[in-house]
Amino acid sequence: VKIDKKARSILNSFPKDVQDYFQEISEKCKKHQFKFRVSSGSKVYSGSGSCGGFFSDSHKELAIAINSPLKWVVAILVHEDSHFDQWINRQSVWHNPKVSRNITYFFDWLSKTKNIKNPTESVKHVISLESDCERRSIKKIKKRWSHIISPENYAQSANAYMFSYLYMAHSRKWISDRINIYSKCFYRNFPQKILSKFEDLSEKYFELFCKYDKNARAAPNRAALRPINRSL
């Protein structure tokens, strides 16, 4: 584990079961020859921006920032651990060539280095990867972490996260950091169960994102770095 003195102090203040989970992730990373980086800040630099945590198979690293409310530290660690599980399972959506290709297309388009005919269709492949991750995560939370974060709140923030990609497909820019999917005043607008489909951005949700979006570029709160080094 790569962890500084301040981060170690923060980690030691966490409940024992959470500390044990960090140790489990450390051992999992060691087994698969990944680095596990624990930051004392509220965000960690992913190489393409700052975020709460990320999993990168190209850099072989899982990283998380822990100077945040405990429930969201646990939520982000569970999310990145679920991306790790996707990577381990060679049959998962993580290894689907069509999904990877469209993820590349979408983020190249978002960064304005490539034009594509239908960004909404490409972004649905991003969402397919993330929604699979979120369903894995909600199972872990219900089984083990519901005393720290309510599954309903997690599902609401996960739904907000998925819809944020549909919004970005309309705006062609990263969402503003004013759009905080971990803020109750924002995530309370979304369903308490993870939706089965994310086909369209309703007018209601579009207006909600517009209300909070101030056109500032910001990396997403969660990240999973694909081999192409894009943040998801």
List PLM regions with ranges.
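Post-HEXXH active-site segment of zinc metalloproteases
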Residues: W87-S128
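Active-site scaffold of zinc-dependent metalloenzymes
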Residues: P15-V18, K28-V73, D81-I88, W94
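Generic preference for flexible, low-structure residues
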Residues: E80, S92, K98-S100, H170, ...
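Long, well-structured alpha-helical subdomains associated
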Residues: P69-W72, I116-E130, R135-L232
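A metal-dependent hydrolase signature that marks the N-terminal structural subdomain at the beginning
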Residues: V1-V44, S58, R135, S196-L232
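Generic signal for short, ordered secondary-structure residues
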Residues: D4-R8, K60, K112, I116-P119
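Short amphipathic C-terminal alpha-helix that caps PH/PH-like domains
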Residues: E80-D81, S137
